[in-house]
């Protein structure tokens, strides 16, 4: 599915002929993704993986020689979801992997800044996520049980990242992210040392392709 390509959507002139604010993002694939009206036809996994591997979690305030990327975070969340629900089906796992995919366009807005600006960003985020879901054969709106699993796994990942990488004390992390999750030594070994951008991009794409193959 990720190999299928359609021609990039043309950039249409605005009515009135004058200059206007640009609301689309040009991708390395050649796509132009309109943030106001995103089309599933303009979503490509190569752009998602490339972008997420270069977007920093925690505003870059993490330990290590490399940023802790949204791509690596997404793989951690998916691993925690699999550990919590071992029988989670392929579509469920794919939805978990893609839960932060809109950030390849809009970046990772930290929670304190979200509190400052309010909920205005959410409409853009929701439109982008719906287009991404449709592109890869998922429902635009996920079932509530799956949404809850994603939220729980995301909070568990945030706790681990906060205490291992972002300098939080255990008590402070519990206050913001809840009780620490149960996880294996393999999860800490495999997902909590920041990777290079190239490695994060490759591993994200490999996991995506594996899920597509079933």
Residue ranges of predicted features:
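Short, low-complexity intrinsically disordered segments enriched in A/P/G/S/L with frequent Arg
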Residues: 9-18
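Metal-dependent phosphohydrolase cores
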Residues: 2-5, 19-214
């Amino acid at each position: 599915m990720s190999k299928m390509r359609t021609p990039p959507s043309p950039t249409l002139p605005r009515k009135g002929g004058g200059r206007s604010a640009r609301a689309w993002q040009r991708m390395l694939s050649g796509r132009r993704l309109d943030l106001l009206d995103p089309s599933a036809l303009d979503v490509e996994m190569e752009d998602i993986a490339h972008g997420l591997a270069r977007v920093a979690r925690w505003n870059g305030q993490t330990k290590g020689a490399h940023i802790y990327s949204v791509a690596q975070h997404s793989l951690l969340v998916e691993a925690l979801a699999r550990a919590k629900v071992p029988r989670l089906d392929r579509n469920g796992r794919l939805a978990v992997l893609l839960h932060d995919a809109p950030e390849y366009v809009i970046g990772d807005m930290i929670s304190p800044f979200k509190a400052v600006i309010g909920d205005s960003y959410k409409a853009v985020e929701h439109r982008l996520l719906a287009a991404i879901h449709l592109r890869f054969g998922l429902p635009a709106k996920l079932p509530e049980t799956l949404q809850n699993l994603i939220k729980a796994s995301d909070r568990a990942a945030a706790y681990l990242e906060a205490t291992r990488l972002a300098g939080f004390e255990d008590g402070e992390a519990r206050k913001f992210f809840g009780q620490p999750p149960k996880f294996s030594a393999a999860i800490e070994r495999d997902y909590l040392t920041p990777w290079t951008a190239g490695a994060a991009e490759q591993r994200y794409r490999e996991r995506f392709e594996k899920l597509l193959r079933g």
